[in-house]
């Protein structure tokens, strides 16, 4: 089924999430429902706030949006975040939302830039 608009939430708003967020914010077929990062002053958090996008320091706030989110992008690189998201989707019965791993983001950013983009992750725990 074709979509007219993708409703996206992004977890991780630092060096990896910010370039992705910039692309997403400029896409007319994307609605950003929220951005999460532990650092409320992370570059992507400031960008989201400036563009009127909801921000939170609790990534589970985005998971709790439920099936309103089409794609939940996790660029934290933290395995515990991925596991918590998967567990929440299972427990809540959410079979709609797709969780996108940072490796897929790396591929997308690399394709857009025409070169391999290396991801940077400063936080090991969330």
Stretch-by-stretch model annotation:
Residues 44, 79-126:
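Rossmann-fold NAD(P)-binding glycine/threonine-rich loop
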């Amino acid at each position: 089924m074709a979509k007219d608009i993708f409703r996206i939430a992004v977890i991780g708003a630092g060096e990896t999430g910010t370039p992705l967020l910039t692309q997403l914010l400029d896409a007319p077929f994307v609605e950003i429902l929220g951005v999460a990062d532990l650092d409320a002053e992370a570059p992507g958090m400031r960008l989201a706030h400036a563009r009127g996008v909801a921000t939170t320091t609790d990534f589970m706030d985005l998971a709790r949006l439920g099936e309103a989110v089409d794609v939940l992008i996790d660029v934290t690189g933290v395995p515990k975040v991925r596991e918590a998201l998967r567990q929440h989707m299972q427990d809540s019965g959410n079979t709609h939302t797709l969780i996108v791993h940072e490796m897929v983001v790396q591929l997308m950013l690399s394709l857009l830039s025409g070169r391999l983009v290396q991801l940077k992750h400063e936080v090991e725990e969330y």
